[in-house]
Amino acid sequence: MSVPKKRNHGKLPPSTKDVDDPSLKYTKAAPKCEQVAEHWLLQPLPEPESRYSFWVTIVTLLAFAARFYKIWYPKEVVFDEVHFGKFASYYLERSYFFDVHPPFAKMMIAFIGWLCGYDGSFKFDEIGYSYETHPAPYIAYRSFNAILGTLTVPIMFNTLKELNFRAITCAFASLLVAIDTAHVTETRLILLDAILIISIAATMYCYVRFYKCQLRQPFTWSWYIWLHATGLSLSFVISTKYVGVMTYSAIGFAAVVNLWQLLDIKAGLSLRQFMRHFSKRLNGLVLIPFVIYLFWFWVHFTVLNTSGPGDAFMSAEFQETLKDSPLSVDSKTVNYFDIITIKHQDTDAFLHSHLARYPQRYEDGRISSAGQQVTGYTHPDFNNQWEVLPPHGSDVGKGQAVLLNQHIRLRHVATDTYLLAHDVASPFYPTNEEITTVTLEEGDGELYPETLFAFQPLKKSDEGHVLKSKTVSFRLFHVDTSVALWTHNDELLPDWGFQQQEINGNKKVIDPSNNWVVDEIVNLDEVRKVYIPKVVKPLPFLKKWIETQKSMFEHNNKLSSEHPFASEPYSWPGSLSGVSFWTNGDEKKQIYFIGNIIGWWFQVISLAVFVGIIVADLITRHRGYYALNKMTREKLYGPLMFFFVSWCCHYFPFFLMARQKFLHHYLPAHLIACLFSGALWEVIFSDCKSLDLEKDEDISGASYERNPKVYVKPYTVFLVCVSCAVAWFFVYFSPLVYGDVSLSPSEVVSREWFDIELNFSK
């Protein structure tokens, strides 16, 4: 529901009832703005509409100019355009790839390429590759993100407008993003953050609109529209990057607080009415957004239906759903008496043996069997070959297929010995069994039970299915002692083991790291080598989605290695260091990702001031001193607290993450900090003092100033000074944003603030 068109510019119509009567809040009997506690949210704007239109046009044009200035430069691949340009090409070729981020934003970029008629032939392989010699619609890609980055600014403006802040406040807050060096750099390149940021901004805006509809009257058309618009925006956030969970936590916090208010007996709602509120929010903010999120994965799987570079990240079962999958082409039925190689899925190590033996005594004093070593070896080798043999007494003949969970024996071809597991401690794990081999005479004699194994299926329902190379995963299960063969690369064997991987018997049989696959059948005859086309196998969507999620989170958590431009979250609010995006050594030009340090430190100060005000207010009120008036406190504990909590939700979780972290991860929190900072200083430059320092204006019936005066002139001077400083920084650092100007070493050094390390400083 839009703000009423009739404007009284700060004057409230006369009230005939107590505006603070809690029983009137959130009820259909009280639709008018003067009958709710947050009446200032619903009252007319404090300034004429034309003033808002003027300022939103100005800041939007500034944002547009900043992002589209020389959008074509550099005509080379910059930073992570390597990844997201490449992914767009894979979508256009329908080649399956793997990435740790959800697909929505990547598909939007690919969609732009499709509209341009691009075929995806260029793969953006390295930073610095020329777009002139490798044609790609890079300007269209960049322009798409630049448009989104530009539109983020008016969305921010209108968010504060809906919260009834003055036009200059809305303009200032949005200016902090419009000419922020980090936002401009990130939203004019082929990256995901432009889509992420505008989705977060839209979420904030839509939720504010929804909340105002809630105050007027719930369950109207406008109420439903803005509820579901909030959910749609949330779905875009979570479908772009999983940091969208932080946005969910912010909106979730606000929704829970609101529901708690509705549950209050003073709200006048029955439990049935409350449950209606709860169910509508659950549906609009959680269930429908989750379905939309799943929809993008369905599109992702539908488009990427051909084998590609992402095959190796997925299971054999998943790969069989892809056209032209090498696994499907090379997959063969494993027969008894076949000579095979067996590969561990997690480490790509082959089951291997050689004539060298385990030492009689390990370094820690434990005793081994001194048997022949069985190790994991990551390279092709004759010693990786094993013959599959049936157990004694079996009538199985040559050429008969091996079935999952049948008892089998494995003969090591090179040393003519049987694979064996026994109750002797392994080299590194005293609780796990040693794996070795024994002679044919011993294996056919008293040690025979210890040579029996089975290719155990990962699912009970697959028992009895035919074993195939490449595509069927299994556990190599030891029948006698009930362990599964396992290897790892956490620590390699010492010199006596030739720095190869330990293989042992893991008592945790169903551990997913116990999975193996037959990699090759060595002794295939010509008849079996003939390729027989196979039908692409279907796999239920949810099964594909679950497997993809597991791989995404697993590989995301593995992004923990050191990176020269990685940084810790404590350094982000002050933008102490940045990231080198691109360099041109011949012309001494560079693009360096860094925040507008003046603007970012202004936000740090604003956050600190807010915390100080809140603490002081709580303490003084506890002592019976009511310094702040009612309207100031409603704004501090209303929209400002909402923005502050949202900032916390988007910032502090990064301290818990072990993966690589970069400055651009702070951009969502920075966006919210800009909204927060603009709103805070309007409150500070208002008449905040209560009418009577000894009376609590929050008590029902207490008199208070409904429209505290804003000291416009000093406030305007303050904002102009800060804006000029922010604009100066943007201009001064613009050579690092656009990379279009060669700086002398002294000019480079003059821009190395805090921990910034630039190229060409010497």
UniProtKB/Swiss-Prot annotation:
Compositionally biased spans, kind Basic residues: 1-10
Chain intervals for the UniProt region annotation (Disordered): 1-24
Residues bearing glycans: N759
SMART domains: MIR
Enzyme Commission number: 2.4.1.109
Phenotype seen when the gene is deleted: Leads to diminished MID2 O-mannosylation.
Lumenal side: 1-53, 158-166, 211-217, 264-283, 615-635, 738-762
GO biological process: fungal-type cell wall biogenesis; protein O-linked glycosylation; protein O-linked mannosylation; regulation of endoplasmic reticulum unfolded protein response
One term under GO cellular component: endoplasmic reticulum membrane
Residues in MIR domain copies: 331-391, 399-458, 464-521
Main location: endoplasmic reticulum
UniProt record similarity statement: Belongs to the glycosyltransferase 39 family.
Protein name per Swiss-Prot or TrEMBL: Dolichyl-phosphate-mannose--protein mannosyltransferase 4
Record lineage: Eukaryota, Fungi, Dikarya, Ascomycota, Saccharomycotina
